[in-house]
């Protein structure tokens, strides 16, 4: 009996020591944010900043893209394979230019607003009222940016034929809609 108690005691001590070592290691592990404190805008990576300034989509239009609403930049890339008419290509280019111009302007506003939020935290001048105002403004800007990209996808849906949309999805590597998915709306676009 004493031998069993001795072995159990050693096992318990060993487990406690291992847990203590693991807890210590966790305390000294660097944060996944380590190094990000040197960013010009703490909340944005260099890539995100560049994408915002360039008017790129950044995944904001995935709800459209993955539900059979093609994006104008990819429609332009696939123009030959989609057999776009000259009129379709022209309208697609125009839609892309409008979207990109609006997205660039909103992106620049987002960066400015993120810098402002960063500054009030860095200087210790943030308070609840300021936080509420600034985050609401950022939320509105991000919403405008997303709406800008989504609207361009809606425009493409009205411009392309159902066959072109199906070809687009195939060329982009998307599978057919699942059987339970809502049917694609009828296309009454201008061709």
Label every PLM stretch briefly.
Residues 9-20:
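Bacterial N-terminal signal peptides
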Residues 26-191:
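Charge-rich (acidic/polar
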Residues 1-7:
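N-terminal secretory signal peptides that target proteins for export/translocation
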Residues 21-25:
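Sec/Tat signal peptide C-region and signal peptidase I cleavage site
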